[in-house]
C-alpha cells in the first residue's frame, strides 16, 4: 500500500532528510512514440497522476520541480532502445507490435531525433 510506504519513509527520514520522486511529466509529453507505445505511455502516465495525488495527500510539505533535457539521438540508437525495451511502457508490448512500431518510427522520424524530455521531481523535506 502506497500510503503505508509513504508514512514509513516519512517516519524513517532523518532531520533535514529528503524524499525525491522522479517521473515523466504527465501532460504534453514529447517522447517520440509509435501508436501502441503512445497508448501504453498515456495509460502509465494516468496511473502516475493518481499516485501523485496520493503523495500530495500523504506528504503535506512537497515541492515540484521540472527538469528539461534537450535530447538529440540518432534514430538507429533510439530504435535499439525500443528493441531492448528500455522504456517501461514497452515491457508488455508484443514482439509483433514492437516490429510494427519500429517500422512506424523509421517512417515517421529523420536520422536524428530531437525532443524535449521533461522530468518532474517531487521533493519532501523533513
Please annotate each region the language model reported.
Residues 1-4, 25:
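A short SAM/SAH-binding and catalytic strip from SAM-dependent methyltransferases
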Residues 3-15:
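A short glycine-rich, Lys/Arg-flanked "PGG" loop and its adjoining helix->strand segment in the class I
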Residues 12, 58, 85:
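Phosphate/oxyanion-binding loops and surfaces in catalytic or ligand/nucleic-acid-binding neighborhoods
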Residues 14, 56, 126:
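Short conserved AdoMet
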Residues 18-48:
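Conserved class I S-adenosyl-L-methionine
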Residues 44-59, 78, 100:
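Short alpha-helix
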Residues 62-126:
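Conserved Class I S-adenosyl-L-methionine
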Amino acid at each position: 500500500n502506497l500510503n503505508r510506504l509513504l508514512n514509513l519513509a516519512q517516519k524513517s527520514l532523518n532531520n533535514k532528510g529528503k524524499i525525491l520522486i522522479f517521473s515523466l511529466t504527465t501532460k504534453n509529453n514529447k517522447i517520440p512514440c509509435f501508436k501502441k507505445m503512445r497508448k501504453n505511455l498515456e495509460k502509465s502516465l494516468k496511473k502516475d497522476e493518481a499516485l501523485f495525488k496520493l503523495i500530495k495527500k500523504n506528504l503535506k510539505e512537497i515541492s515540484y520541480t521540472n527538469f528539461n533535457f534537450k535530447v538529440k539521438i540518432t534514430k538507429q540508437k533510439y530504435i535499439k532502445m525500443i528493441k531492448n525495451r528500455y522504456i517501461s511502457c514497452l515491457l508488455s508490448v508484443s514482439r509483433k507490435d514492437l516490429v510494427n512500431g519500429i517500422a512506424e518510427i523509421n517512417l515517421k522520424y529523420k536520422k536524428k531525433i530531437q525532443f524535449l524530455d521533461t522530468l518532474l521531481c517531487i521533493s519532501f523535506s523533513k
